[in-house]
Amino acid sequence: MENVSKKLLVGAGVAFSLLFSPFSQAFAAEPTVGERKQVDNVAHRGATGYAPENTIAGFDLAVEMKADYIEIDVQRSKDGKLVLIHDTTVDRTTDGTGKVGDFTFEQLRSLDAGSWKGEQFAGEQIPTFEEILERYHGKVGILIEMKAPELYPGIEEQVAEALKERNLDKPQNEKIIIQSFNFESMKKMNKLLPKMPIGVLTSNRAHTTPEALQEFATYADWFNPSYGIVTEELVDEVHNLGMQIGSWTVRSQAAADFLFGMGVDAIISDYPDYVDPRN
């Protein structure tokens, strides 16, 4: 997942100028006959088809399965610790009940985040954001989803600071990307980390209009829709605006093959082995 462009390409003439630029022609070059375009393999919350989501076990397995990226969900504990969990409650993926933001970090850490997936995962803990950065940066790309940032005022600054402390906000560190369904949060992240690739998530066809895509292109590098709304025309339009496109959530080989055919740049899947045939 390269940080192809953004921000510099703003205004009414964006699509036209890109269409005829050498950069655009190189970016849009199709594979020769018999070749398949390189597609990034993103392990959705880790290898969640086989291991509990947002856990070290799931992320380690994704690395073992040679995923290009792990996707993580970042929220915050009551006492201000950045933690990894998808739902805004702990009910589905732990042995506890209640809202994530109502637990202290110590309380969250005491929960069993693995047994729901299988006895062999008993005792898996909710990881911290910092642990993931320390453990996996340099081994695998990290796609950071800001989960429900509207519930955690100031979380954007906190995430940005954690990245800056580790020198991960620089353009050479291209294998870290930040995304969210909350577009205002992503505009904020773009201002806080102007060199960091930004992605927008959606499952809404209303966000695929030319006008909407042009707005996203003013601050985002990635447009990441659910695969049910992906078309070849959408992929082409996203590319013409200088963005890349990654689609989710693949849970079958048929879905992966469909997205290969559409020409997307990344496939986000619970099963990294479904995406492996990219090579």
Question: PLM features: residue spans?
Answer:
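Phosphate-group recognition and catalysis centered on beta-loop-alpha active-site segments
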Residues: 2-279
